[in-house]
Every structure is written in structure tokens, then in C-alpha cells.
Amino acid sequence: MKYNIVHGICLLFAITQAVGAVHFYAKSGETKCFYEHLSRGNLLIGDLDLYVEKDGLFEEDPESSLTITVDETFDNDHRVLNQKNSHTGDVTFTALDTGEHRFCFTPFYSKKSATLRVFIELEIGNVEALDSKKKEDMNSLKGRVGQLTQRLSSIRKEQDAIREKEAEFRNQSESANSKIMTWSVFQLLILLGTCAFQLRYLKNFFVKQKVV
């Protein structure tokens, strides 16, 4: 296979995370590659987009596709990745050994004479660092969950206290209403008794007056 080498692309450091972006132009079936030294455990995550030139403008076309390969040049060009994407997609690769790796990109389109533009954005970091970051994020998340749980427990206790106060107030209100009702009935009975006594007294008084 004939390779056209893209020089001067620095996409990563051996341990720290880095981001690199590049684009190149090619015809259908034309392969372009670059080389990069990777350390064991380096994780590559790439965002890939392919555009087709139409009337002077580069546009996405679902009929186009992009093949990505990764070879270990230090191990007799052992191929460790061979992936075919549509006109847009991503790629993920973890270096199994330390050494020079060759990254190759081959765009395909039905019209062979069309000019294709490949846009590549790669993010490369160390798996252990990413795992550590995940653990930190997980611990932070657990801490926040714990705080929310404590807050929820506190809110529930406040709600229970409010319910108890409401129940106590309701009982006091019912007791007061009961006493008021009892006292009102008692007063009404006294009033009725008084009225009955006065009516009887007046009746007897008028009877005596009539007799006299």
C-alpha cells in the first residue's frame, strides 16, 4: 500500500491529555497517514467528519465513508484497528504496547474524481489518569448524594415535626370547640329554665290577681 505521510501533527504527550485537530484533502480511495509514538495505556478518542466537494462547496454526503486503520510499526506493522465509518462518526483506540503507531485514513465516494475533505479531531490521554478522574468524579458524586440524602432526611424530620404540631393544634382546637359547645348548651339550658320559671311565676301572679 502506498502511503502519503502527513507530517508535523503532534496530537499527544505520553502521560498528559492533549487535543489535536487537522484536516486534509484526498480523492476516493487515497490513503493518508501520520505516525505517533504512544505509550502503553494511552487512550485515543477521535471525532471524524468527511465532506464532498460539490460546486465549490464541501458538503456532507451519506454515500461517502471513511476507513481508519492503526498499525504497530514496531511489531512488523501489526494491525490493531481496522474500522469503517460513515461520513461522520468516531473512533476509540487503546494502545496495548509502547511504540510508534501509524494512523491511516482512507475516504471513499462513488464519484472517483470528487475532492474529499477529511476533518479529524483527536483527544489522547492516559487510561489510568482517566480512571482516576472517573474515581474522583464518582467520589464527588457519592458525596453530593450523601449531602442530598442528609438534606432529605432533615426535610422529612421537619415535615414530621410540622405534622405533630398540626395534630396537636387540631386536638386543642377540637377540645376548645367541645368545651365551647358544652358551655353554650349549659347556658341555653339555664336560659330556658329561667324563662320557664318566669313564665310560671307570671302565670301564677295573674291567676292570683284574677282571684282577688
From Swiss-Prot:
PROSITE patterns: GOLD (PS50866). Pfam families: EMP24_GP25L. Residues 1-20 form the signal peptide. Residues 21-178 are lumenal. InterPro entries: Emp24-like (IPR015720), GOLD_dom (IPR009038). Residues 200-212 are cytoplasmic. GO terms for biological process: endoplasmic reticulum to Golgi vesicle-mediated transport; Golgi organization; intracellular protein transport; vesicle-mediated transport. It is a single-pass type I membrane protein. It is found in: Endoplasmic reticulum membrane. Residues 31-124 form the GOLD domain. Belongs to the EMP24/GP25L family. This is Protein ERP5. It comes from Saccharomyces cerevisiae (strain ATCC 204508 / S288c).
